[in-house]
C-alpha cells in the first residue's frame, strides 16, 4: 500500500542484489528490476512492461494528479530528475530489451534510445468463448492505479449515457 513512498530507495536496493555466478540474468521490469547488476561477463535480458512510468509519461498522474498529498508531490518533484538519470543509466546495463508491446518498445526507444524486440504476453484464447447473447454495458477489468485512468472511463460512459462495469482492486479503489 505504501510502496510508492519508497520509490526513491528502490534503485539503491536493486543494485545491492549480488548475482555472482550467473551467465544470464532475466528480469521482468516495470520499475527498477532492470537495474539489477549482472555479474562480470554475464548477460542481462529484460522483459519490460514499461519504463519507470512514475518519472516519465505518467509523472503527472502520480505526483500532481491531486491523489497524492503535498509532501508526496514535493518529494516526487525533488527526486524526479535523479530517478530519470538512474533509469537511463540502468537501461544502459541491459544487453537486450524485450517489450510486451509495440507501444512499450516505442517508449524504450524514446527514453533509453535503445531498440526492443516485441514479445506479447501469452494468452490462452481457446479458454474464451463469445457469449450467445451480448449485454448492453462496457466492461473494464484493471488495477485501480492512477495511470489506468479508471476515472476517465467512468466520465466517458457518463457522457455517452452507457453502463460501465468495473472489476479490479488497487490503491484508488475507494475513489
Language model: regions and residue ranges:
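Membrane-proximal helix-turn-helix segments that form the acceptor-binding/catalytic region
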Residues: 64-97, 105
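Conserved donor-binding/catalytic core segment of Leloir-type glycosyltransferases
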Residues: 123-125, 129-167
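A short beta-strand/loop micro-motif in the catalytic core of glycosyltransferases
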Residues: 26, 93-101, 165
